[in-house]
Amino acid sequence: VCRSNVFDLHGEWDLAYLDPPYGSANVKMPSSRVRYAAYYHLWKSVVLNDQPTLFGAAGRREDSRDGISASVFEDFHMGTSGRLKAIEAIERLVQQVKARYILLSYNSSGGRVTREEIQQMLSENGTLMDVMAVDYAHHNMANMFRTRKWCCADRGHQEYLFLLRKE
């Protein structure tokens, strides 16, 4: 386990497990509404063992605000390649991580990057050895009053695991 900016890691590993944030695939909801930093603020406080300034009814860390803690992995804008910035970031990470194998976890209904886009990108960066899909129940945002309907409610909810051998 490493506690630093993932793009600044300098180690070498046999296996790297990557579970990047994926924001929201719900086009009815601004992507900034679903940020990992907002959901994982408690864990960050435990790891840092600090006394952060809090805000809001939930008592979140000040540094988990949408405008402060945006993640490139959650960016739904188009990048210079004509692809989503999120897939560009995942590809950059895959290319930079010094590991013989990468196990990448991604969600079928959480992000705007598709399974096919990830498979294509991984195939261009090594040998895609296996893809697993694990079924999960939808989370409580499926019942949000504001949107009335989760964008992917008609599909199953799966967590994908991609095993890549880098060459």
Pin down the residues of each PLM region.
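Class I S-adenosyl-L-methionine-dependent methyltransferase catalytic core
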Residues: V1-E167
